[in-house]
């Protein structure tokens, strides 16, 4: 079930168009992204690195830099401990290279997803002490590790936490909230309530990018040297699904510009392994091609493989490593498809598909892909989904949510069910014992206040734009709005009453449908639909009947008109350009 909404934000779109030399349509698209002032729009369209916030505003960044400077100058050993996803690997890379530039004696460890689980733990701390490490810096983890940090302190280690995740909290009997910060020598996280940094929604890699800038300032190193990390910080921002607004937009835009001629040999090899060297790389390539290759190592082997690729400078070795990661990602895709199929079968067979919050138990699923499966299931059912699998220590799970359900807060209400948990409003991870599974499902659903309205997929349309209005110049102008992603989605347009003149299935898999459409005034346009063509045809039959559907497929006259949402594009084939639309709904 879907509900379509057309944005109705008001402004003088002609005036905005005149100021920025753009069409009123593009002006409307900017207003739909909650931009109200000329300054905001100027920064959105043409923001540069000079518009980024002062790194020194991050609470404890200066304090942490002073500590690290003293450790470097006295020859102390430093160890980085990161997460194993794209943001964790990227954070580790930036921190390692930045500390090396400052002369640090530094190494790194990345927790094994299966053996160690998420984040810093007692074993990693003990190993650091055994190895003669003086200082541990966490990145993309540590904010929820108060006990582990305290244990490190007891062993005489210096610990610095850099993270971007939500601060753990407890709700008191009087309704007030108390936050539980780790007792590290410095805690650098923009989500701290007393942190003056103006924008809290940055990823772990951007946090350490900012920290390295502060460190460079302290060492008298030109901070422009830190710009070599921008393409890595940009990739992490997209892959960690940070909102692509404010300074994140600038970082990603600049990173995409630089990646076309990156000096990071391993990253260039990964681009070539995925046959992207001749393409203009976009946020899509970060999120759906390059990022998943880096993630695949942390999921199926070791995230060290991905980090070693980024650190490697030998072209042939980089080529081998990049091809291995690309192949690993192909295996991950197949495992995911099998897992999604099993998850749907589980829900239907248990009768839990009707629950408000879906809890799927797949004991034999590889724990590393539980989050991906949860995401696919959320898209299919449009409900919050937890996918849980069995491990040596008990159960581990990942959750993905919908807008109406704050996953982390809901889990915090039943924290007695977990051994460990953490996350965001839209995603979470946890571990628990098997005898808690049914209690977990029951309590989540008992507490859930979700309604059928919350489960309806909400389709937000930017503009009802007739196909007759489309032109190549207008479509090219929409590129000003890139990069697209979370909170800066690709614009969605709508057209009512399109007549289907014909259609045909393309490709061997049948997953692509080409339609030939026209409006009431006779304007014709080609359209592509990249969903399940058989599902599309089934819905067509259910809507208009088998006989009428067959007439449509054969290109015969009929009485069916279709409403669509779409994004326009300029298609080039054998030197010829034509405008087509890609149907979304």
Residue ranges and their predicted role:
Residues 164-165, 366, 424, 512:
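Histidine-centered active-site/metal-ligand motif
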Residues 7-135, 154-156, 173-175, 183, ...:
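Hydrophobic helix-and-loop "lid/oligomerization" segment in the mid-to-C-terminal part
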Residues 1-3:
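Catalytic domains of riboflavin
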Residues 126-205, 209-218, 228, 245:
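Active-site cavity-forming subdomains of large catalytic enzyme subunits
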Residues 206, 371, 375, 564:
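Short alpha-helical basic/polar micro-motif
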């Amino acid at each position: 079930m879907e509900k379509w909404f057309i944005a109705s934000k008001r402004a003088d779109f002609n005036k905005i168009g005149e100021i920025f030399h753009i069409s009123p349509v593009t002006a409307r698209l900017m207003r739909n992204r909650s931009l109200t002032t000329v300054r905001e729009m100027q920064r959105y369209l043409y923001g540069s690195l000079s518009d980024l916030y002062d790194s020194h505003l991050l609470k404890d960044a200066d304090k942490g830099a002073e500590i690290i400077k003293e450790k470097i100058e006295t020859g102390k050993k430093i160890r980085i401990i990161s997460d194993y996803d794209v943001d964790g690997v990227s954070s580790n890379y930036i921190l390692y290279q930045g500390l090396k530039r400052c002369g640090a004696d530094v190494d790194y460890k990345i927790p094994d997803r299966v053996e160690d689980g998420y984040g810093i733990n007692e074993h990693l701390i003990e190993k650091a002490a055994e190895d003669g490490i003086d200082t541990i810096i966490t990145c993309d983890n540590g904010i929820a590790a108060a006990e582990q940090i305290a244990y490190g302190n007891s062993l005489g280690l210096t610990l610095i936490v850099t993270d971007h995740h939500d601060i753990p909290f407890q709700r008191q009997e009087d309704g007030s909230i108390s936050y539980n910060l780790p007792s590290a020598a410095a805690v650098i996280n923009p989500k701290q309530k007393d942190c003056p940094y103006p924008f809290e929604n940055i990823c772990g890699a951007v946090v350490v990018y900012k920290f390295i800038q502060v460190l460079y300032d302290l060492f008298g190193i030109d901070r422009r040297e830190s710009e070599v990390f921008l393409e890595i910080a940009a990739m992490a921002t997209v892959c960690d699904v940070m909102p692509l607004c404010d300074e994140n937009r600038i970082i990603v835009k600049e990173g995409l510009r630089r990646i076309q001629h990156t000096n990071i040999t391993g990253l260039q090899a990964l681009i070539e392994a995925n046959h992207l060297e001749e393409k203009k790389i976009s946020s899509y390539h970060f999120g759906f091609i390059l990022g998943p290759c880096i993630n695949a190592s942390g999921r199926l082997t070791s995230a060290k493989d991905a980090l070693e690729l980024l650190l490697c400078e030998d072209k042939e070795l980089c080529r081998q490593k990049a091809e291995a990661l690309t192949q690993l990602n192909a295996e991950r895709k197949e495992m995911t498809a099998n897992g999604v199929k099993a998850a749907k079968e589980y829900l239907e067979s248990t009768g839990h598909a009707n629950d408000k919050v879906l809890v799927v138990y797949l004991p034999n699923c590889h724990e590393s892909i539980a989050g991906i499966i949860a995401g696919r299931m959320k898209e299919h059912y449009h409900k919050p989904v937890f996918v849980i699998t069995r491990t040596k220590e008990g159960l581990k799970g990942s959750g993905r949510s919908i807008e109406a359900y704050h996953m982390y807060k809901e889990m915090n209400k039943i924290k007695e069910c977990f051994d460990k948990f953490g996350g965001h409003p839209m995603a979470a991870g946890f571990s628990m014992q098997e005898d808690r599974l049914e209690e977990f499902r029951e309590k989540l659903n008992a507490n859930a206040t979700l309604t059928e309205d919350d489960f309806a997929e909400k389709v937000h349309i930017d503009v009802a734009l007739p196909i007759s209005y489309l032109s190549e110049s207008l479509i090219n102008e929409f590129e000003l709005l890139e990069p697209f992603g979370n909170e800066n989605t690709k614009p969605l347009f709508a057209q009512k009453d399109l007549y289907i003149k014909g259609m045909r299935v393309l490709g061997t898999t049948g997953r692509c449908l080409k339609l030939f459409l026209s409006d009431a005034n006779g304007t014709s346009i080609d359209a592509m639909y990249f969903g399940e063509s058989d599902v599309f045809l089934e819905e067509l039959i259910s809507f208009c009947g088998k006989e009428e559907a067959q007439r449509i497929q054969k290109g015969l006259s009929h009485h069916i008109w279709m409403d669509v949402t779409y994004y326009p594009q300029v298609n080039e084939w054998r030197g010829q350009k034509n405008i087509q639309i890609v149907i979304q709904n």
